[in-house]
Swiss-Prot record:
HAMAP family: PSII_PsbZ. Pfam families: Ycf9 (PF01737). This is Photosystem II reaction center protein Z. Belongs to the PsbZ family.
Length: 62
């Protein structure tokens, strides 16, 4: 269970890093928002899911 928790935390950190870098780049590009809206929403949905997964796994660890 600890390995699953560590992988979930790593995935959350990696997704957070990608969103922090990627979303401003998408919004700054000339046609960024209209062409990459689905990718931004998918990344945000993945991030929210990972937050809940880490919280659930944390309740089993501690």
């Amino acid at each position: 269970m600890t390995i699953a928790f560590q992988l979930a935390v790593f995935a959350l950190i990696a997704t957070s890093f990608l969103l922090v870098i990627g979303v401003p780049v998408v919004l700054a590009s000339p046609d960024g928002w209209s062409s990459s809206k689905n990718a931004v929403f998918s990344g945000a949905s993945l991030w929210i899911g990972l937050v809940f997964l880490v919280g659930i796994l944390n309740s089993f660890i501690s």
